[in-house]
């Protein structure tokens, strides 16, 4: 009887508190109470009024509310604001109560957006609080507009920050300045421990102050925090200074900006102990580099970039772009001769004794040893029909820009992250591609490194880097490649539509250098682009040779290689060490996905990759075309002989109408567990003869678990033929079937369901029916799906079959 007595005591306490708080409420709160009490639903309105009164005084009553019995607490939960609702979560769970429905309703009412159908929301509280944090940070939500969001006792940013797992920074770096402000120190400290993914979308040009704030933010979140992934999306015209800032900070480099406050965490960490050398010490290079050559080549690269920008945007306002430190100021230590070459005395604004800023990490010898071969390839980031222009040193250029004023940034990432090259005699002309990659007629190899990072520090770096639709200039590509060569903590790299062009060769060299580093963790590479200077299979071979420890490789090229047109001027081909004919060594690939451009692919090249990938478990070929069915058969035979661990095989957008014997060969493979033929025109020829052969092969295969046949014009006849796979005399263990986009009508689906019922095989897993002609007879379709759900899990949609008119006409 103790429990009921406690419940009654708590209930009486709640009523007493509610009555007292109601009497103490203001007239504004009391007026609605009278009107509510007089209505036909007086008891619920009164209880709700009491609950609102308790919610309004939670600062005093919180501990008592937490101790309320479960039924009463369950009625109060929807009346709490988001701050107390979040705080009471643990107590509610102990009482067997869930707040997920409340958070979902808050999402629908306040966020007014529908989550993606591909997103599986496991915790609506975390999702709401994360979105709420972003809206408050950007100023896109007014917390005073709704009582559920407004409470003077709580800071919206601080209270929601611990739920933020990913943060998106957009446009003009909105939110970066607010987060690093002193009043939000606790917010930033909380983010440093909770945030895992940092995303940048649609970035625009930013000023120096915004970049300085971003520098501090990245330092706190990456170097002293838990951020492990940085992703950049949709940046059509990347600002070089900002892009290189994000890259270098992600790689673990830190150098405070001019006039910026010192890092408190760095001071605490370094107090009482000597600095240690971590895995990044390989980047620091020699303590006495040849600065003259480095500075000379860096100055030439930067001068060329300024000249190119001036031509492209002659009317751009100076205030809208981040000014660069003057070349003369950044190269003070290079000597007076170099000063005179780069700037006339009239343009010098450097104070005596200015210290030269440190420079970027030195490339490893394996990366720099082959850079001389780049003279054969253009350095542009996209296909160039014209040869690159040549330029002279900037001596005597009156338009050279310098940094002026006390607010100018004297320490810039440009000062210590750039590729350097060997030495050239004064007065000689240099191509920008040769300067950028250091191909200077085989000069001293020691000149191919970078100046040491004497004043910069190395901290923890991210493990996942993603660049989506971010065009990379030569300068940006060189910076990325140089950082990659020693980025041993990197585990996954995604480069999607970045316009690499011939810079892909530098990327391969940097990946080869990274693979040679002790402790290299790179295991996943995703590469896609419109064009490639190498055919996709040669590029795949080069990547596999450069990264033998890679586990996941996804590569896609939309258009044929330039090498397919040898008549293009300047198309001299890749360096010989990139496309060597030597046999590919054994690698660790487990997953290989390839998207091919139009044109027949040489089967022997693909077979050579497959033979070296004995651990391959998943293979996906998209839009692959072979010269003949025999070539396709050669690939399948290679899979059977050399890839014994292969479990999943996928073909998409391939014409396999003439490869029916090869398809049967696959279906008889007793090692494959899942096969996908997506839009492969399987039943375009001889369907009456091929379908029985296909069903017979599947009935004898006891290892195949999943078969996906979307977009193959199966039709009702083909579906009914497939039903025989589940007959009583079948040894098939198929449990997943995808027959989407196959011109299936309701009557055929109903007959398919009846046959499954008749054979009584029981539930066989999942059946996918997207985009079929089920709307032609809605009643029959519902009956068919009802019957099917007794034997399997059905996933369908309401699709307008009139969209398939063209497909229907093509089958007439």
UniProtKB/Swiss-Prot annotation:
Residues 267-408 are annotated as: Disordered. The Elongin BC complex binding domain is also known as BC-box with the consensus [APST]-L-x(3)-C-x(3)-[AILV]. The keyword Membrane does not apply. Residues 45-54 are annotated as: Interaction with Elongin BC complex. Disulfide bonds: none annotated. One of its GO terms (molecular function) is identical protein binding. Probable substrate recognition component of an ECS (Elongin BC-CUL2/5-SOCS-box protein) E3 ubiquitin ligase complex which mediates the ubiquitination and subsequent proteasomal degradation of target proteins. Residues 387-401 have a biased composition (Basic residues). Residues 354-381 have a biased composition (Low complexity). Part of an E3 ubiquitin-protein ligase complex with Elongin BC (ELOB and ELOC), RBX1 and CUL5. Component of a probable ECS(LRRC41) complex which contains CUL5, RNF7/RBX2, Elongin BC and LRRC41. Interacts with CUL5, RNF7, ELOB and ELOC. One of its GO terms (biological process) is protein ubiquitination. The modification Phosphoserine is found at residues 155, 276, 326, 357, 373. The modification Phosphothreonine is found at residue 327. It comes from the Eukaryota. GO terms for cellular component: cytoplasm; cytosol; membrane; nucleus. InterPro entries: Leu_rpt_41 (IPR026137), LRR_dom_sf (IPR032675). This is Leucine-rich repeat-containing protein 41. Keywords: Leucine-rich repeat, Phosphoprotein, Repeat, Ubl conjugation pathway. The lineage of its organism: Eukaryota, Metazoa, Chordata, Craniata, Vertebrata. LRR repeats lie at residues 487-507, 518-530, 531-555, 613-635, 636-659, 701-728, 731-752. The keyword Repeat applies. Pathway: Protein modification; protein ubiquitination.
């Amino acid at each position: 009887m103790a429990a009921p007595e406690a419940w009654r005591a708590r209930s009486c306490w709640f009523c007493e508190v509610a009555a007292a708080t109601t009497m103490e409420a203001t007239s504004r709160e009391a007026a609605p109470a009278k009107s509510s009490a007089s209505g036909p639903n007086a008891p619920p309105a009164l209880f709700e009024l009491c609950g609102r009164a308790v919610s309004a005084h939670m600062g005093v009553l919180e501990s008592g509310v937490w101790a309320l019995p479960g039924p009463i607490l369950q009625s109060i939960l929807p009346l709490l604001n988001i701050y107390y609702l979040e705080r009471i979560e643990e107590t509610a769970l102990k009482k067997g109560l869930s707040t997920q429905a409340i958070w979902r309703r808050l999402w629908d009412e306040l966020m007014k957006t529908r989550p993606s159908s591909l997103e599986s929301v496991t915790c609506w509280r975390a999702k709401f609080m994360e979105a709420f944090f972003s809206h408050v940070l950007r100023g896109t939500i007014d917390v005073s507009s709704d009582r559920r969001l407004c409470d003077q006792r709580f800071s919206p940013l601080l209270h929601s920050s611990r739920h933020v797992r990913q943060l998106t920074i957009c446009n003009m770096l909105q939110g970066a300045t607010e987060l690093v402000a002193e009043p939000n120190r606790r917010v930033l400290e909380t983010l440093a421990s909770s945030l895992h993914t940092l995303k940048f979308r649609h970035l625009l040009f930013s000023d120096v102050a915004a970049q300085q704030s971003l520098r501090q933010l990245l330092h706190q979140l990456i170097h002293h925090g838990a951020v492990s992934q940085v992703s950049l999306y949709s940046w059509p015209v990347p600002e070089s200074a900002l892009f290189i800032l994000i890259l270098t900070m992600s790689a673990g480099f830190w150098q405070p900006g001019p006039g910026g406050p010192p890092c408190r965490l760095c001071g605490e960490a370094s107090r009482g102990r000597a600095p240690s050398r971590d895995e990044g010490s390989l980047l620091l290079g020699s303590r006495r580099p040849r600065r003259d050559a480095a500075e000379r080549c860096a100055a030439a690269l930067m001068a060329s970039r300024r000249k190119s920008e001036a031509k492209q945007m002659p009317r751009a306002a100076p205030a809208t772009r981040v000014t660069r430190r003057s070349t003369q100021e950044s190269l003070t230590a290079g000597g007076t001769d170099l000063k005179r070459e780069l700037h006339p005395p009239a343009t010098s604004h450097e104070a005596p004794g200015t210290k030269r800023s440190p420079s970027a990490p030195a490339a490893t010898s394996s990366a720099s040893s082959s850079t001389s071969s780049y003279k054969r390839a253009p350095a542009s980031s996209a296909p160039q029909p014209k040869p690159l222009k040549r330029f002279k040193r900037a001596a005597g250029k009156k338009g050279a820009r310098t940094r002026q004023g006390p607010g100018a940034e004297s320490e810039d990432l440009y000062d210590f992250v750039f590729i350097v090259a060997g030495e050239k005699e004064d007065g000689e002309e240099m191509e920008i591609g040769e300067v950028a990659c250091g191909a200077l007629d085989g000069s001293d190899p020691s000149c191919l490194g970078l100046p040491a990072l004497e004043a910069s520090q190395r901290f923890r770096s991210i493990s996942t880097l993603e660049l989506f639709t971010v065009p990379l200039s030569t300068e940006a590509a060189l910076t990325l490649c140089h950082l990659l060569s020693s980025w041993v903590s990197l585990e996954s790299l995604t480069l999607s539509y970045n316009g690499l062009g011939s810079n892909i060769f530098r990327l391969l060299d940097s990946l080869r250098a990274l693979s040679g580093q002790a402790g290299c963790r790179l295991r996943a590479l995703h590469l896609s682009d419109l064009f490639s200077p190498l055919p996709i299979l040669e590029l795949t071979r080069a990547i596999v040779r450069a990264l033998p420890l890679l586990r996941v490789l996804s590569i896609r090229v939309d258009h044929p290689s330039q090498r397919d047109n040898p008549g293009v001027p300047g198309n001299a081909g890749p360096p010989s060490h990139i496309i060597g004919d030597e046999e590919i060594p054994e690698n660790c690939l487990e997953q290989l996905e390839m998207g091919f451009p139009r044109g027949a692919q040489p089967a022997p090249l693909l077979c050579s990759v497959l033979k070296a990938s004995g651990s391959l478990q998943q293979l996906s070929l998209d839009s692959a075309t072979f010269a003949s069915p025999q070539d396709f058969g050669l690939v399948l035979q290679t899979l059977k002989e050399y890839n014994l661990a292969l479990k999943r095989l996928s073909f998409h957008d391939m014409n396999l109408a003439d490869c029916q014997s090869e398809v049967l060969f696959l279906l008889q493979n007793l090692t494959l567990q899942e096969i996908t033929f997506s839009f492969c025109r399987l039943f375009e020829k001889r369907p009456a003869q091929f379908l029985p052969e296909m069903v017979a092969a599947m009935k004898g295969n006891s290892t195949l678990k999943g078969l996906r046949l979307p977009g193959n014009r199966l039709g009702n006849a083909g579906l009914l033929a497939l039903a025989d796979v589940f007959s009583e005399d079948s040894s098939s263990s198929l449990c997943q079937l995808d027959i989407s986009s196959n011109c299936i009508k309701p009557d055929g689906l109903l007959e398919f369901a009846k046959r499954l019922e008749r054979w009584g095989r029981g539930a066989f897993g999942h059946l996918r029916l997207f985009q079929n002609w089920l709307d032609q007879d809605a009643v029959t379709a519902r009956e068919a799906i009802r019957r099917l759900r007794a034997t399997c899990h059905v996933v369908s949609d309401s699709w307008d079959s009139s969209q398939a008119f063209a497909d229907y006409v093509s089958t007439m």
